[in-house]
């Protein structure tokens, strides 16, 4: 099982890139991008708490005496990105759009700040695993800041392409996370200790992440097309026709 939802080789990072991680959370993608190539990695989120966690985690990965790469994080909304047009070479938006009512406006903002020919990697919960969670627990999607919709991947692709993108790849991720969320929804508790099945499966996920045994990596790879929790898509921003304004 991988910590990352986005596969970085599909982003095609090159030295000097500027990358935006929109809704970076605790920094898993923004920090990894910083470590992979001499780029400027920018992470934004609405949660000050998550950004503080990102700062703390980054100290473990900071590369001293290397001015060719940087990580910048700040509070900002995807509905009004504080960046000029055509600022970024790559944009990541992982597990974010399902939290936003007006997600199409966020996609339009991503298109605005991404350079022509730039790559946009995004993920949302896959329809069936998410549908089961909603059926098992109302509280799952009624919590403050929770999921406001279940996406149909084909419809979402159409929305993104209408904004001026072309999809070039797709895969699924985190199949081993699905039983955890189904158990959590089945034994939902608003407060206090989680039910035993939830605790034990969480321990398994942590062990798997830290130990990375070949068996579970193989299982995750085999099961992802069938029941991966996330659907991940990669798009390129179309260049404007000759003579049009960028």
PLM segments and residue spans:
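Conserved catalytic loop of SAM-dependent methyltransferase domains
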Residues: 169-209, 229-230
């Amino acid at each position: 099982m991988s910590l990352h939802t986005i596969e970085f080789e599909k982003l095609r990072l090159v030295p000097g890139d500027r990358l935006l991680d929109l809704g970076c959370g605790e920094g898993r993608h923004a920090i990894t991008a910083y470590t992979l190539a001499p780029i400027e990695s920018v992470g934004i989120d609405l949660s000050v708490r998550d950004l503080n966690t990102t700062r703390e985690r980054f100290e473990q990965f900071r590369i001293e005496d290397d001015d060719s790469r940087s990580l910048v994080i700040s509070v900002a909304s995807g509905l009004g990105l504080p960046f000029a047009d055509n600022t970024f070479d790559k944009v990541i938006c992982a597990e974010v759009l399902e939290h936003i009512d007006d997600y199409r406006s966020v996609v339009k903002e991503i298109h605005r700040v991404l350079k022509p020919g730039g790559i946009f990697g995004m993920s949302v919960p896959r329809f069936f695993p998410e549908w089961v969670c909603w059926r098992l627990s109302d509280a799952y999607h009624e919590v403050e800041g929770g999921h406001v919709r279940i996406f149909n991947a084909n419809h979402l692709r159409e929305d993104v392409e209408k904004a001026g993108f072309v999809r070039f790849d797709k895969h699924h991720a985190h199949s081993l996370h699905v039983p955890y969320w189904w158990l959590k929804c089945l034994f939902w508790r608003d407060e206090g200790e989680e039910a035993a099945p939830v605790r034990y499966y969480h321990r398994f996920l942590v062990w798997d992440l830290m130990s990375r045994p070949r068996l579970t990596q193989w299982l995750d790879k085999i099961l992802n097309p069938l029941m991966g929790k996330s659907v991940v898509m990669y798009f390129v921003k179309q260049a404007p026709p000759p003579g049009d304004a960028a």
